[in-house]
């Protein structure tokens, strides 16, 4: 789901816990650790991103000005959404420029678990219904990708005015011998010939357990000077 990434260049939900092994490692274990990992748990990583409590800040410099976005993900339990019982998580995105708060946005992601299926997203002026076109794999090979979701965004729950339609694609690329970048790429608004918001790519560095090790957001959008990209990452 697109969360608040376009509105606030945020909306990531990261698991704060990273499991680490300690102690001695025998020779067989050491040999195994040097082998490149080629498969990663996509579903577990996405559950950590969207359904687990978290609090994190990403940073960027836009036209020489320091910008930071803090986002907090708060699981809220079970609710009714679009006629079905689902799980939901609230996302609060707070944007600061030069350390001064300029915007605070609240959105809610809706999904079901076991298996993970995305259902939609709401904010003050959006009511979004997701149609998942492909299942989320338990495991995937590095280099894999899938366009898995189409989302229709309405101005309110009455669904009388369709204001946005976009697709989402996940991709998995190698980051190191034992980690990978899982990116969620949102298309432009398919209802517009030229979308001023452009595209958003939310990327998460994951390990073999699906823990979130790092994150970043890239927002590419058209301007008078051509395509521009704003990059947000951990400080």
Regions found by a protein language model. Give the residues of each.
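Sec-dependent signal peptide recognition
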Residues: 1-7
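C-terminal motif of bacterial Sec signal peptides marking the signal peptidase cleavage site
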Residues: 13-16
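N-terminal trafficking/processing presequences and adjacent post-cleavage segments
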Residues: 18-43, 126-149
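Acidic, serine/threonine-rich low-complexity disordered tracts
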Residues: 20-101, 155-235
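Short, surface-exposed linear segments at secondary-structure transitions and domain or protein termini
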Residues: 79-82, 112-120, 137-142, 212-214
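An acidic-aromatic
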Residues: 98-131
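Solvent-exposed helix/loop surface patches that form functional interfaces
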Residues: 124-178
